[in-house]
């Protein structure tokens, strides 16, 4: 079958296969589109944490992005782990060269196990330059707190943080509410014109490794197929909820 669309994924590799590039490829493929990759780092990790991170040279990242796009033009781009200033800068330059407009940024900063995946200088450039370049920013609550220098304890706090990001140049923001203590999962979509809340029953499970990667890749895929950003977020959230609810337990712990 011919793939519906082509998605370029710029992110790190997860050796466990549950998150990162591996989760992205699986998601894009499962939704019927074609996945291409530009790997920014190689991580040795499992569901409990990150053992090590091997950086890919910035020149090789730019070559992956530009050489691939020159031959197979992406319909959308999903960006994940950008762990250093050099990586953020080279991705910015490459995005400008290839000129793709539909870009989803999942600002991966901290792994589920607590390991920090980006340095402070990179966060500064991401905030000042990269968020202005993308169509949608998809932080979870800890990431939104880092980006806005605020504390989030409620849905109202999520909305306030999203509006700060909009005022800083983001076009659209989806803050994921999974870290709030609640029986209802609430994700907040915000732009200059509207605030939309997606409500779903929270699934009581530990199988959440890679859910942020999966969500952003699903959004990119639906968006590339002509859906609006709002509809893409809605459909992607439903897809991830289904995936969480049916996820097998593979790990020992």
How should each PLM-predicted stretch be described?
Residues 13, 79-80, 115, 208:
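Glycine- and other small-residue-rich loops at beta-strand/loop junctions that grip anionic moieties
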